[in-house]
Amino acid sequence: DLMVVLDSVIARGYIDITRLGVGGGSGGGVLTSWTIGQTDRFAAALVERPVVDFASHTVVADLNGFFAQHWFHDYPWRSPLEYFDRSPINLVERVKTPVLVIQSEQDYRTPMDQGIGYYNALRMLGKPAKLVLFPASSHGLSRNGPPSQRVERLAIILDWFTRRLLPPPAAPRSAGD
């Protein structure tokens, strides 16, 4: 369990527990959205290219049969509760962590409806969230997208976590203070 590892690091005194961030893309986006629906330990989260609703994802993504065959016991129309219970969207009301959602507009592996839907659900509930869409980019934006968009993506992520995790800069001191 990821929280067991985190607890071990915390117990050693290596980190400030008030400034924890979490994030991931694709499968990591699934894990991040699931994690922040289970705990409020994190001060900021990045959910990138997520799958948050496995039922809809199963019928619209490019690997549409994969999840039904390998992760679930049947198709979503035959086993809707299994899909819902394992989908991070069902935990959205519990989220207390500010969330940055990043989605590529040409992503067929985790189509836009997943990231946009998650963002919309957070906003409908009054949760702090920001959505960034990258046009003409695919699921591989972080590795092989247009260089300008890869740089922009990293700047957005850095800004998001810097604002939420780092202490504010100290006020300048003048001579005689």
Give each language-model segment a name.
Residues 1-177:
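Active-site-proximal cap/loop segments of hydrolase catalytic domains
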